């Protein structure tokens, strides 16, 4: 077992009002799972990914990685969990604006073999000619593909992807999801949020969220 989420709750305030983004969510993610998370906007899907990824501290409950609560450890442990075990593709991409595409990708490379694979990923994602461009010089789709390569380049234990093909044409969507499936076949674990049928067709498990809860 790779990850266990036990009864996590997360609330936010909007002005004077409080709303619940996650309401007692529990979930087991086994090594080698390919989990697709569905649900309407505001259902809690992205908040769940952020909690799994070590980015937001739940108000209650626990997120266990190999038996250790990632939020009940020293911050350095949480940082190592995020850097060494998680590949995260955000909807907002979060590319460093002062770094080129290839420099952004290298931020996620911890071994020489990861760096050696960069050009193959750039070619398969049609970004070879953009490798020395800065984020402001890229289209939204090109930024998305660069963010994807950064997330997957180190073959992390767990790939978290939030709408990974949302800004891509069918050809680039297919190329990206082919790389995700190859990663999964080699033993990687995937948690993916998407409304795109192509993105979820390889999923081995599916859940649906509504109002911060898993309903199906």
Tell where the protein language model's regions lie, with residue ranges:
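Conserved ABC ATPase signature
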Residues: 134-144
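ABC ATPase NBD coupling module
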Residues: 70-87, 185
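Conserved signature/switch motifs of ABC ATPase nucleotide-binding domains
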Residues: 133-136, 154, 186
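Hydrophobic anchor residue at the start of the ABC signature
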Residues: 148
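Conserved ABC transporter NBD signature motif
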Residues: 61-72
